[in-house]
Amino acid sequence: KNIEYLLRMLGNICGVEDLAITTNGIYLKNYVKALKESGLFRLNISLDSLDDSKFEKITRGGKLKDVLDGVEEVLNLGFKNTKINVVAMKGINDDEFEEFAKLTLERDLEVRFIEYMAMNKENLASEDKYIPMADIIDIIEKNNELIVQPIPMLGSGAAKIYKIKGAMGKLGFVSA
């Protein structure tokens, strides 16, 4: 609630040159115009599946269409450096990596694949979801020519950046 007000306040702080947020995107379409008007520069959108039923299960009831509609609205409003963050999980979304990569063909966005990591002792059993970044790249390269990109100064973090030959957008790969 009132995030637009908070963003305006943060944007008015002397020296703030970049303002970005990460969202699950569920309500993004409803707020994206106000976010843009409040001075937000960049958006990172967490999206771990492009399959309706998997998405609903992962998010415990979220609707994929709501997030995808929000992404399109973000692009229509001219946000730059929009990123889709995908946590890569073996047996859950590993059959969707190429479909995610294809989102960059006609959209100026960056799809980032992030290696799955167990966060505590209780999650060690879920290490079976881990997929090495090299395997993710291999899956995408089977049907696409990937071109290494120079890393931009702003907002690149630890990602290795690639582009499918001829694509508008980019692919980022973040190792755990």
For the regions a language model picked out, list residue spans one by one.
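A short, surface-exposed helix-loop junction/capping segment
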Residues: 115-120
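Accessory C-terminal segments flanking Radical SAM cores
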Residues: 121-176
